[in-house]
Every structure is written in C-alpha cells, then in structure tokens.
Regions:
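A short, surface-exposed loop/turn module that caps and links secondary-structure elements
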Residues: 33-60
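Enriched for short, Lys/Arg-rich terminal
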Residues: 1-7, 15, 19, 23-30, ...
Length: 88
C-alpha cells in the first residue's frame, strides 16, 4: 500500500489559478506538492479519522489564499477554494 497523496484541484479552481502569473502558479503548486508529500509521510495522520472542521489554508505572496482539506480516506489533498485575499 502506498502512502502517497495526490493533489485534486477542480476545473473551475484550475482556471482561476491558470489566470495568475507564472510565479504564483509555481508557488501554489510547490506548496500543494509539499503538503501532499507531508501527508503521505505521516503515518499517524493516515490512521486518524477524518475530522470535520475548518479547512486549512495557506497564502501566496500575501495576495492569494488557498483553502484545502486532507482526505485520508481517498488519500487526496483537495483544494476547496482559491482567491485574492480581501482587503481590509
């Protein structure tokens, strides 16, 4: 059995990411690959039940916010939302 997690990005979210600069796209991809690699390496997380709670997030260049969830059942890092950080 493999411990590898895959990254899942919906078509609509892929389109939003695709409209960004190359450096933003690269940073998003790097972060998601790192999260997937870390999730696959964590044996404790694989045995823990999927908890329903607030989704996790990270920021790229202080201007973009990415919400994601780690689904241990399907072994995926699922991107839930991507967008510009609201001003304020």
């Amino acid at each position: 059995m493999t411990n590898e997690y895959k990254v899942h990005i919906g078509t609509e979210i892929q389109g939003r990411i695709g409209r960004c600069r190359a450096s933003v796209r690269a940073a998003v991809g790097d972060n998601l690959r790192n999260i997937a690699a870390t999730a696959g390496a964590s044996h404790a997380r694989a045995r823990a039940p999927l908890k329903q709670g607030p989704s996790m997030r990270f920021y790229v260049y202080e201007g973009y916010r990415i919400f994601y969830q780690i689904d241990a059942r399907t072994r995926r890092v699922v991107v839930l939302d991507f967008g510009v950080v609201p001003a304020g």
